[in-house]
Design a protein with these regions (language model features):
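Non-transmembrane, aqueous-exposed alpha-helical and coiled segments at domain scale
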Residues: 2-371
Length: 371
């Protein structure tokens, strides 16, 4: 904790603070930051990052074709160093970019969208403990270098390599705090279920990063119920709120705290049981969609709009046996489930995953760390 003599304590030995400030101002004038200070990078420090991975520094990891811009291993390392990563974090950053490259939306410009989406990373496996990734209390908050800087490394790459500056190529209407950094780890040790990455066929001993494109994180306060159905319906209500229904369907990642996970597991619910329950109950009455002008789809974009709009067309539910019941999810696999957070209160979250039409059965991509 800082004391009244913090200035003396903060002055690192044999460091020229004026030169550090000059370097930070230089990076700011070059627009190589996210608005926060960055770590000055030297060639020798950069080489520590590159030495930790067996990759050609000029290998292209990710391309946004319509911008004609490419991110190489070297550029990824530079931005990881700027973000404050330690060299041992770089294999995670590298795998994150590989996972992002498999996602269809970023390469098509979704990070430039008015919707204000952001990259979101989940890390599983032994690497969590090795580099100090937080999977417990304050999972979406500050205080952990690995979480903060790995997520930030991706965002700085977006800005510095692809030019996604706000008010320029990044046209987000409001954006999200996740645009600074969004990287969490699963609390595998306190989960009653198999870890997220083992659902993809990996061994528990593998370290894996999963990448999503997200729009928001919604709080679920359910501190008193011990009934799995009641708790699941709280998640359902957040998933199918009308404000979330920008397209015909949505997708979500349930980030469940250990206390809530135990409510489900004690009642004999598996992840698939919860997934199927949420899928079946994530519906809206058409009258509810009429009330907010979202009871039809756009011919051009397939976004939700009023049936009175000249560009409107019927949604999929119109051709079913129950045209007045509109599903928010296209398939149970539209719901991903993981356990993270502290085991001290019933406070979970729904992470809203960006979904286009037609929706993907699995709205995420992943890559093994160190592959």
């Amino acid at each position: 904790m800082m004391s009244t003599t913090a200035l003396d304590q903060a002055a690192a030995p044999e460091v020229d603070a004026d030169r550090i400030r000059e370097a930070m101002e230089y990076y700011w004038t070059k627009e190589w930051t996210d608005g926060l200070p960055v770590v000055p990078v030297t060639e020798s420090y950069l080489n520590q990052f590159l030495a930790g991975v067996d990759r050609d520094p000029e290998e292209v990891l990710f391309t946004i074709t319509h911008l004609n811009r490419h991110l190489t291993v070297r550029l990824a390392a530079i931005n990881a160093a700027l973000a404050g990563c330690l060299p041992e974090y770089f294999p995670v950053v590298l795998a994150a970019w590989e996972a992002i490259a498999k996602e269809p939306h970023p390469a098509r410009g979704i990070w430039q969208s008015t919707t204000g989406t952001a990259p979101f990373l989940v890390v599983n496996g032994p690497i969590r403990a090795e580099i100090g990734l937080n999977s417990q209390g304050n999972i979406f908050g500050s205080g952990f270098r690995a979480n903060a800087t790995i997520g930030r490394a991706i965002r700085l790459g977006c800005i510095n390599v692809f030019g996604l500056h706000p008010h320029k190529l990044d046209q987000a209407t409001q954006g999200t705090p996740a645009k600074y950094s969004a990287c969490i780890a699963e609390n595998e040790e306190e989960s009653p279920w198999p870890a997220l990455h083992t659902e993809y066929g990996f061994d528990a001993s593998d370290s894996v990063v999963t990448a999503y494109v997200i729009r928001s994180v919604m709080h679920i306060e359910a501190r008193h119920t011990m009934e799995p159905e009641q708790l699941a319906l709280d998640f359902v209500d957040s998933i199918c709120r009308t404000g979330a229904l920008i397209h015909e369907y949505t997708s979500a990642l349930l980030v469940i705290v250990p206390e809530h996970a135990e409510v489900f597991a004690s009642a004999g619910w598996s992840k698939d049981d919860l997934r199927n329950f949420v899928f079946e109950h994530s519906v809206r009455r058409r009258s509810e969609l009429v009330a907010v002008g979202k009871d039809a789809l756009s011919h051009k974009t397939r976004w939700r709009l009023s049936s009175e709009h000249p560009d409107s067309m019927p949604d999929t539910a119109s051709t079913t046996d129950e045209p007045d019941v509109v599903r928010a999810l296209s398939h149970p696999s539209s719901i991903q489930i993981m356990v993270a957070g502290a085991n001290n209160a019933g406070v979970s979250a729904v992470v809203e995953i960006f979904t286009l039409n037609p929706p993907r059965e699995n709205p995420f991509s992943y890559s093994r760390i160190g592959a």
